[in-house]
Structures are given as structure tokens and as C-alpha cells.
């Protein structure tokens, strides 16, 4: 049916071109979802007294306010699905607290959870606490610092659900959207099949950037210690998938790291912890934060290998004719 409709449309175009007539646009029907969004997105508003529109025409023309735009003006920093903004806040919090005595709670209070509720660093830390500011309502809240001689276990007990509710949530202003909302970390931050494409793009981009860079990266080429948790066949598949002959570089990027300012340092792209290249060669070393999406070093390679395996099976099952037909179908949709 779609093919017949396309042919009718093409005949209409050819007929119009032959007769040099104007082509009538096809009607577009909004879906139910689009109609619902339009209904609740726009709000009627009255005409301005200084409007250039004649009085007799005002009753025939209705003006509307775009509630989405209005909300974005009042809450500039509220972006639930902006991963880049989330990572920027995490990075700023890590840099801000890198040299102070603070023991993050893995579940409730850490740079990731703070950033997911809209908090970012504010001014400088005192001897007893670290202040943070909401990027949206500009409210201020503080996190206590670990004092010399304090027991770490007792300190981390304080950084728990109580501080999450009283400080991280409770210190937002009543009308602040971050008070009732939080970035969906399972969907936006942690690794999943839905966001795996972002990891593929990141690794491809980093390979191009590092390989084409003028400064040589002092990483031992094909050092198996970087990717000791992978078999030789697995690292070969992954390197071939990313079109990179340097196994060490692929292994480094699979761990979530990227080249830092100093040639012998790398930095995680998700928790922003730093490590030297020498430390990475120790098989027991894990430089990521406990809440980091790359803390389980085997997770990302496993997901990519499963994806590669599915592609290989699909290619081997299809004959040449079937592959050509599938390619033709894809091209038709484009």
C-alpha cells in the first residue's frame, strides 16, 4: 500500500512538472500524542493593548503562550535529559572537592547524586563544610567535611538518607523543579542497551582525537595488562570493530578513561577520577568511584561483544540476495 501511494505521489509530481503547475501539498495528520502535547503546551492569552491588530480582527485571532518556553525562562538550569550538563556538574564537583577531606556515601551523597538533583559548587569550602548552589533556584546547601581524627565509618553513617532528604532535596526552594525531580540515572548515566550508541560514538571520537593528535601518547602499545580481563580473541574483535590496531588504546577507552593534560595521566569521562598509566597496568587497580558507570570494567566490553555477536550471526544467516534486499529496503526508507 505504501509503495502504491509513493508511485501515485511520484506520478503527480511528474504531471505537475510537465504542465508547469504548482504542486498541492499533501495533508499531514497529527498523531494523538502530538495533539495532546499541543493541547497542554499552549495557553490562551489576551491581546496586548498596543497590538497593531485592528480591534475588529482581535475576536477572530487567538493568541497563545508557549508554556514550555515560559517554564524554560524561569528554570534555565532544569534539564532532566541533558547528559552533558549532568557530567559537567559532576566534573565541577569532583574538581571542587578533590583536595578536601570528604568521604562520599556510595548510595545517597556523592557527586553523581548531587549533580542529578541540580547542585553545583558554590564559592570555597570552609574548614567544616562544603557549600553547594542549585543551578536553577540558586538555593544554598552544605555538606559536612571529615575532620582529622574522625572515624570514617561514623562519618559515612551521617552522609545517608537523612542528609539526602533534609539537604539535597529539602534545601531546594518550594517552586524549584529539582525539588520533585531527579535525573533518571539508570536511563541517562548508567550503561544500558539504550545508550550503548553513545559509548560507541565516544570511543570512535577519542580514537580519532588521540591518533591524530600532535602530542604522542606514552601508552605501551598492545600492553596486555591494560585489557587483562579480556581474552586475545575478544580484544581483537573489539579493536577491529573500532578500526584501531592499538589494543592498549582500545582497552583504555573501554575502561572509560581518556587522555588528560599531562602525558602520563588519564581521567575517567564519567566520575572524573584521575590515574597514572603505570597504575592502570596493575591488574588489581580500579581507579573509578564506586558509583561510576565504569566501575565494573567488564560490563562495557561484554555489552559490545554481545552486539558484535548479534551482527555476525545476522550476516552469516542472510544470503547475498537477502542482504541486498535488506539494503534496498533501508535505502527506500531514507
UniProtKB/Swiss-Prot annotation:
One cellular component term from this protein's GO annotations in UniProt: nuclear pore nuclear basket
Compartments where located: Nucleus membrane
Keyword Transport on entry: yes
GO biological process, one term: mRNA transport
Record keywords: Membrane, mRNA transport, Nucleus, Transport
Membrane topology label: Peripheral membrane protein
GO molecular function: zinc ion binding
Main location class: nucleus
Biological role: Involved in the nuclear retention of improperly spliced pre-mRNAs.
Protein name: Pre-mRNA leakage protein 39
